[in-house]
Amino acid sequence: MKPVTLSTLNRYKQEKKKFATITAYDASFARLFANEGIPAMLIGDSLGMTLQGHDSTLPVTVEQIAYHTRCVRAGAPNAFLIADMPFMSYSTPEQACLNAAILMQAGANMVKIEGGSWLIPTVKMLTERAVPVCIHLGLTPQSVNVFGGYKVQGREEAAAEQLKQDAMALEAAGAQLAVLECVPVSVAKTITGSLNIPVIGIGAGNVTDGQILVMHDLLGLTPNAPKFSKNFLQEAGSLPEAVRLYVQQVEQKLFPQEQHSFN
């Protein structure tokens, strides 16, 4: 695989080429994902649930994300790596810069932060200091205690409009990628069409520029897997074939389908 950059992902959006991304936490799986055509990987704070066994992402630390970023970079030297900034690691712009530096030095190409327009000063400060930023809107797992659980966001007209306004404001502040999680397909379509930056969806239908799944969901390892996930290993005969099938179905708009989406 040739080195994947932000320019690569931007070109995919311009060419309307759907692309598949995935969470990764170690060198072996990262190598497998890269070999099967995954251009970008997220070192997600989801590791708090998938690897550590917690019931939320809140206990994850910056040091843990940095450790797993180094592991993934070793296995996928040419992939575009997005590192999650954990809970309360970016509560001020200054704190965000210090913690983002740790993740970038560990091998990340970009950091991801969850939230709305309150993040504008943080996005500006990070991008002014050469740290590319991915924003995460909709269901933001670090806010699970505020939401009262993992619930679909943006179903009401006012909430949907707020998501769109937040996304546009954060793009204007310098964000270069967006993740939309658990929002109605109509909302995802509007936001994706309103932004110039690539939008990656999870539980947002097949109208976004790219898709992402937690690797454990894709491989059928998650008990009570979320509606938006699919066990690709069930249809495939091996791990590489499962990943290849995921990539193909995303590129051909065969995944996600209506049963994986919200209205």
UniProtKB/Swiss-Prot annotation:
Biological process, per Gene Ontology? pantothenate biosynthetic process
Please verify whether the record's keywords include Plastid.
no
Per the entry, which co-factors are needed? Answer: Mg(2+)
What keywords tag this UniProt record? Cytoplasm, Magnesium, Metal-binding, Pantothenate biosynthesis, Transferase
Name the catalysed reactions.
3-methyl-2-oxobutanoate + (6R)-5,10-methylene-5,6,7,8-tetrahydrofolate + H2O = 2-dehydropantoate + (6S)-5,6,7,8-tetrahydrofolate
User: To which pathway does this protein belong?
Assistant: Cofactor biosynthesis; (R)-pantothenate biosynthesis; (R)-pantoate from 3-methyl-2-oxobutanoate: step 1/2
Q: Active site at which residues?
A: 181
**What InterPro entries would the database entry show?**
Pantoate_hydroxy_MeTrfase, Pyrv/PenolPyrv_kinase-like_dom, Pyrv_kinase-like_dom_sf
Q: Name one GO cellular component term.
A: cytoplasm
Amino acids binding Mg(2+): 45, 84, 114
Question: Where would you find this protein in the cell?
Answer: Cytoplasm
Q: How does it assemble?
A: Homodecamer; pentamer of dimers.
PANTHER family listed in its UniProt record? 3-METHYL-2-OXOBUTANOATE HYDROXYMETHYLTRANSFERASE
Q: Which protein, by its recorded name, is this?
A: 3-methyl-2-oxobutanoate hydroxymethyltransferase
State the organism named in the record. Answer: Proteus mirabilis (strain HI4320)
